[in-house]
Regions:
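Domain-terminus/edge residues, biased toward the C-terminal soluble/receptor-binding domains
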Residues: 27, 42-44, 48-266
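Acidic/histidine-rich, surface-exposed loop or edge segments in extracytoplasmic proteins
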Residues: 1
């Protein structure tokens, strides 16, 4: 509650921020009326929305450093210690599970939004309304087993791979190498063959200065049947500074054919 008041100015202000962010990420069947998550009229969500929220949270992987801890001791000022145990037992008992959040209320039952990663393939599972904590764990195991046994991830191109060059306005370099900001992937069934892919690069007009990590467009990944299987943000391979007057002079000289001879004389 203190954190909500710190971030939102008040609990209601924080709730407004939450609901606004939910709409932005596509969790349109969720509405919060309080900051603590306990049952209340008008306070609801769905399994699908919880998976969307989890996916957004995983864009900040540092969270897994905390959610993957099974047990820890907190030391008090008097030297005594408090033993804390993760209520997500799968962190310890299922290989690859490293998060995310359990929950329980009388209305919602025992809930678990879990995530696990194996062979660079990460899954998110959501169970709600379970009768016991044991059932929420066992049903989560069934879902994760099904996912890992049925599907695989095909990495089409890796983060940082080049997709070609595009023009840069007012830059020290007039062209930039465009690279993927993240891996381009497709989820396939284990029995599906890998197909051929094409890339449709959609880049905004780039104007210097521009830095590595700045999103300058997207790349559509298209399979052999013409389906868009992924769309990945793209960035520049190297920082490009804004050109100064000397850069323009040298560029113009090279364009008319004198640049090389002048540079040699210097």
């Amino acid at each position: 509650m203190a954190l909500a008041e710190k971030i939102g100015g008040s609990q209601s202000g924080f709730v407004d921020m939450l609901n606004k962010r939910l709409k932005e990420i596509g969790a349109t069947n969720t509405n919060f009326v309080n900051a603590h998550g306990l049952d209340a009229e008008g306070h609801y969500s769905t399994a699908r929305d919880m998976s969307i929220i989890a996916r957004e949270l995983l864009k900040h992987p540092k969270i897994l450093e905390f959610t993957s801890i099974y047990e820890e001791y907190l030391e008090k000022n008097d030297g005594s210690r408090i033993w804390l145990v993760n209520t997500n037992k799968l962190v310890r008992f299922y290989d690859g599970v490293d998060g995310l959040k359990t929950g329980f209320t009388k209305t919602a039952g025992y809930c678990l939004t879990a995530t696990a990663s194996k062979n660079n393939f990460r899954l998110i599972s959501v169970v709600m309304g379970e009768d016991t904590s044991e059932n929420r764990s066992s049903d989560t195991v069934k879902m994760l087993n099904y996912g890992f046994n049925t599907f695989k991830i095909n990495i089409i191109k890796t983060k940082g791979e080049s997709l070609g060059k595009v023009r840069v306005e007012k830059g020290k370099q007039d062209k930039a190498n465009i690279v993927l900001l993240n891996d381009a992937t497709e989820i396939l069934k284990n029995t599906d063959p890998v197909t051929e892919y094409n890339f449709n690069l959609k880049v905004n007009k780039i104007k210097a200065p521009v830095k590595v990590g700045d999103i300058v467009g997207t790349a559509e990944i298209i399979d052999s049947e013409g389906n868009i299987v992924d769309e990945v943000d793209v960035t520049v391979e190297k920082d490009i500074k804004k050109a100064n007057i000397l850069d323009y002079m040298l560029r113009n000289l090279k364009t008319i054919g004198f640049g090389k001879s002048i540079l040699k004389q210097n």
